[in-house]
């Protein structure tokens, strides 16, 4: 999952540095992530993981760090699994 998140951030995040240079806790907005790039990344994540970000997750905090993105994706995947069961 983390490799996919990092790849999508590299492709869509328009960061000022390579994602490989960022720790999982680094501030993505400090690294150059804009609101527009966050939305582009969110759409790519939705497609890659077959999830949909609810309005409640459309917050700056959801994309504050790689770990924050991972937490959102994990929560959405867990919710989808519960609905499928």
Q: Predicted segments — roles?
A:
Residues 1-43, 47-85:
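Phosphopantetheine-dependent thiolation modules in NRPS/PKS and related acyl-activating systems
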């Amino acid at each position: 999952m983390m490799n996919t998140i990092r790849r999508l951030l590299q492709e869509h995040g328009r960061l000022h540095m390579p994602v490989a240079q960022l720790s999982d806790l680094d501030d993505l907005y400090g690294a150059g992530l804009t609101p527009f790039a966050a939305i582009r990344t969110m759409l790519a994540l939705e497609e890659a993981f077959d999830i949909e970000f609810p309005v409640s997750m459309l917050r700056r905090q959801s994309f504050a760090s790689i770990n924050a993105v991972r937490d959102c994706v994990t929560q959405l995947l867990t919710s989808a699994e519960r609905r499928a069961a």
